[in-house]
Amino acid sequence: MMSISPIVSLRRCDNEPSMPDEWRLYKLASRLRTFSNWPFTEDCACTPERMAEAGFVHCPTDNSPDVVKCFFCLKELEGWQPEDDPMDEHKKHSPSCLFIALKKKAEELTLSEFLKLDLEHTKIKMQKQMNLHIERFQAKANEVRGHLEKLDADETQ
């Protein structure tokens, strides 16, 4: 399986209480709604229900119709086969995900438990954003270094 970075589109239901989209994803039904065009639906291990239970949301791209991302640890996976078990794949590719380590449903968490869990989720998001900015900065620094080295080489000739 390969990791890529799609955007998740979350449809809202009229009967859901007002809350941030990210909090809505703690609910199984909200994650399940993202699988409307999932390529595996019957006679397979990776049904939409099992994918959502494992914490995944479906975020397809034109080139990758089977891309999913854990709403919590942000691990992105694609290249699913009908026999792939979503929970096993999640544990294999992101063993430290706190969502899959929960011993109860997210809806059963106390407010304190939920807020602690969401704090960890926020840290994960911030780390991912920071890593992205660092990668962009390093790429730009390498580009500038190349230009400077070329200028230096031109001057010494």
From Swiss-Prot:
A Pfam family annotated for this UniProt entry: BIR
Binding site residues for Zn(2+): C70, C73, H90, C97
Tissue: Highly expressed in vascular endothelial cells of tadpoles.
Outcome (variant: T47A): Unable to increase blood vessel size
PROSITE patterns: BIR_REPEAT_2
A biological process term (GO) from this entry: mitotic cytokinesis
Outcome of mutating C97A: Unable to increase blood vessel size
Residue ranges of BIR repeats: 31-101
Source domain of life: Eukaryota
Kinase keyword on record: no
Family: Belongs to the IAP family.
Protein name: Baculoviral IAP repeat-containing protein 5.2-A
Organism in which the protein naturally occurs: Xenopus laevis
Designated gene of the protein: birc5.2-a
